[in-house]
């Protein structure tokens, strides 16, 4: 009996095992199939904008042009609202820029001088034997004069070639009423009719003070400097009088426009109450600008990685920077 029952039992076991395997066939097959592939997409980095320390600015031919650190050149054709990067061809520090005779001329460290006749689109290097730093440049009567920490140089061909004129340590220069006037250390004031010799020394009354900026407007010359120094000349730079600035911080630059003289400096903006510059008042605080210019009804000021615009010196709008 036991022998006859063994075969059915074995058969039943085999049949049952095969049935179990057949029932799990789909699960086994599914487990062997590869799962969905997860693809990781690296996000495209957001482009970063590099802002430069801007040191000088001017207006000409309806264009504002600013210059600064590492050869930076910026241009604006919409009254300072937007700015385009230019290519100067140098990495040297550019300290100041001027316009005249359909040409922009920029000067900077190590004797760097550049000129552009296409509104700052392209730049060429001028020829000079000097290697000192230049801080100021101005144009008048078909002449460009540049000033720096060791000498004054002059160009009569729109910045293409330069001649060394004399040895002075001066910081800035302007042109008005057929004369160049420069300002500098220890209250220095120098004057020349055509940028050539002689450069005559004038008494400023600012001994011991470095005069950083100078401008001409409404037949008046104004210069500004350390400790809030502000001086004025109404006789073409021959004599100078002190004007209370209402501030004690350093003033770096001054410009004329909208019937007032406006000066900028360390954490301050001041302006005259009328076009004679007899009295000045504080317009704004908290702004440190290194240079200011005026054009098309707008003041444009530059500083460390910033550019601001204003029509009245009170309200300022940032148009460039971090």
Q: Where do the language-model regions lie?
A:
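Sec-dependent N-terminal signal peptides
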Residues: 5-13
């Amino acid at each position: 009996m036991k022998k006859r029952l063994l075969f059915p039992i074995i058969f039943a076991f085999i049949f049952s095992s095969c049935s179990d395997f057949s029932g799990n066939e789909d699960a086994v097959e599914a487990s062997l199939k590869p799962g969905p592939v997860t693809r990781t997409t690296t996000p495209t980095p957001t482009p970063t904008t590099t802002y430069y320390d801007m040191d000088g600015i001017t207006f000409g031919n309806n264009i504002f042009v600013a210059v600064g650190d590492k050869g930076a050149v910026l241009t604006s054709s919409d009254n300072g609202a937007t700015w385009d990067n230019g290519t100067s061809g140098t990495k040297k520090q550019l300290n100041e820029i001027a316009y005249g005779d359909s040409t922009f001329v920029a000067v900077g460290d190590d004797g760097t001088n550049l000129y552009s006749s296409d509104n700052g689109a392209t730049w060429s290097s001028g020829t000079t034997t000097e290697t000192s730093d230049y801080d100021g440049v101005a144009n008048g009567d078909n002449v460009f004069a540049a000033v720096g920490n060791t000498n004054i140089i002059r160009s009569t061909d729109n910045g293409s070639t330069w001649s060394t004129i004399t040895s002075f340590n001066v910081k800035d220069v302007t042109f008005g009423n057929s004369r160049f006037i420069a300002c500098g250390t220890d209250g220095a004031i120098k004057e020349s009719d055509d940028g050539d010799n002689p450069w005559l020394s004038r008494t400023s009354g600012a001994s011991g003070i470095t005069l950083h900026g100078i401008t001409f407007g409404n037949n008046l010359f104004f210069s500004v400097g350390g400790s809030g120094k502000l001086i004025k000349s109404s006789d073409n730079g021959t004599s100078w009088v002190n004007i209370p600035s209402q501030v004690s911080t350093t003033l770096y630059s001054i410009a004329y426009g909208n019937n007032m003289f406006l000066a900028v400096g360390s954490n301050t903006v001041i302006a005259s109450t009328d076009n004679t510059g007899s009295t000045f008042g504080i317009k704004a605080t908290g702004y440190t600008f290194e240079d200011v210019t005026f054009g098309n009804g707008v003041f444009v000021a530059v500083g460390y990685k910033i550019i601001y615009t204003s029509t009245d010196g009170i309200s300022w709008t940032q148009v460039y920077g971090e």
